[in-house]
Amino acid sequence: EIAQNLGSGIPHIRTKLPNGQWCKTPGDLCSSRSECCKAEDSVTYSSGCSRQWSGQQGTFINQCRTCNVESSMC
């Protein structure tokens, strides 16, 4: 199974969330977009929490993802 590119190589801004925890990086499990770190280049890249298939778990999971806004995969 080929792992999906979740944008882990794209520079992002590490910020503390209102709950005191650090934002989650691409590939981390999430429940909402606000938990995910934003890309440094917010014009070129979009960040969010998206549903991905996990072959390991045999179910869908939500993971932080950063992708190019011009990509059809974003």
Swiss-Prot record:
Disulfide bonds join C23-C37, C30-C49, C36-C64, C67-C74. It is found in: Secreted. Belongs to the neurotoxin 21 family. Expressed by the venom gland. One of its GO terms (molecular function) is toxin activity. It comes from the Eukaryota. GO terms for cellular component: extracellular region. The presence of a 'disulfide through disulfide knot' structurally defines this protein as a knottin. Neurotoxin with probable ion channel impairing activity. In vivo, is both paralytic and lethal, when injected into lepidopteran larvae. The keyword Secreted applies. Keywords: Disulfide bond, Ion channel impairing toxin, Knottin, Neurotoxin, Secreted, Toxin. InterPro entries: Cys_Knot_tox. This is U1-cyrtautoxin-As1a. It comes from Apomastus schlingeri (Trap-door spider).
